[in-house]
């Protein structure tokens, strides 16, 4: 049996990560937040006081990165996300990490991968694809509230500005720009709770995963 793969893409703070984790738990699949792989490389550079454009060391860290050590709570800071967005512009680093992400997707019984180029580049043959949308104001508010909930300090307008710049970088970069796969289901979560989004996603997944199991 080949692994069952679910691809979830979307801009920063759209809710794709939360959705991916719920789907993976519900269907007993492995989960990979591919954004954490770029954050992991960025963190390694910053820990060694190296510049984000230090390609030689970034390549080394990308090759050595152990996906099993990626910790969402540890790598989830807004600042690290900004750094990872810049790391992701490097085509050599993307190539290394994409290959490792594809190998992860081969794990049985299957995986849910979320990121920005899963359905288009990493797993173009995924069994089902989603593209999660939300307007930038809603995403900024979510990120702001998330930081406050964790006891951190944040400025809503700075977060909004950062997300707008990040969207621009992700959409316009030459390598793997952020865009929906042609056969992706588009879900706008601006006015939806995570429970409602999850229910809609499951309504698309259920018939396909049943066919996969039978087949």
Curated annotation (Swiss-Prot):
Claim: Glycosyltransferase is one of the keywords in the record: no
GO biological-process terms attached to the record: pyrimidine nucleotide metabolic process
Enzyme class per UniProt: transferase
InterPro entries: Cytidylate_kin, Cytidylate_kinase_dom, P-loop_NTPase
HAMAP family noted in UniProt: Cytidyl_kinase_type1
Pfam families, per the entry: Cytidylate_kin (PF02224)
Lineage: Bacteria, Pseudomonadati, Pseudomonadota, Alphaproteobacteria, Hyphomicrobiales
Binding site for ATP: 10-18
Catalytic activity field: CMP + ATP = CDP + ADP; dCMP + ATP = dCDP + ADP
Keywords, sorted A to Z: ATP-binding, Cytoplasm, Kinase, Nucleotide-binding, Transferase
Subcellular location: Cytoplasm
EC number: 2.7.4.25
GO MF terms held by the record: ATP binding; CMP kinase activity; dCMP kinase activity
GO cellular component, one term: cytoplasm
Family: Belongs to the cytidylate kinase family. Type 1 subfamily.
Protein name in the entry: Cytidylate kinase
């Amino acid at each position: 049996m080949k692994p069952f793969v679910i691809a979830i893409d979307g801009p920063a703070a759209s809710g794709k990560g939360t959705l991916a984790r719920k789907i993976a738990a519900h269907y007993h699949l492995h989960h990979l937040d591919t954004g954490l792989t770029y954050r992991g490389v960025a963190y390694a550079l910053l820990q060694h006081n190296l510049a984000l454009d230090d390609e030689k060391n970034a390549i080394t860290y990308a090759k050595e990165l152990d996906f099993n050590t990626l910790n969402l709570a540890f790598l989830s800071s807004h600042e690290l996300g900004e750094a990872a967005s810049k790391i992701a512009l490097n085509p050599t680093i993307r190539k290394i990490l994409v290959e490792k992400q594809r190998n992860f997707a081969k794990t049985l019984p299957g995986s849910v991968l979320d990121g920005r180029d899963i359905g288009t580049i990493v797993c173009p043959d995924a069994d089902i694809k989603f593209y999660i949308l939300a307007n930038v104001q809603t995403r900024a508010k979510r990120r702001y509230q998330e930081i406050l909930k964790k006891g951190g300090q944040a400025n809503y307008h700075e977060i909004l500005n950062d997300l707008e710049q990040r969207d621009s970088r992700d959409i316009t970069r030459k390598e793997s720009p952020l865009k929906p796969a042609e056969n992706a289901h588009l879900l706008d979560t601006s006015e939806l709770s995570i429970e409602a989004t999850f229910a809609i996603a499951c309504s698309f997944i259920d018939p396909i995963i049943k066919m996969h199991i039978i087949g």
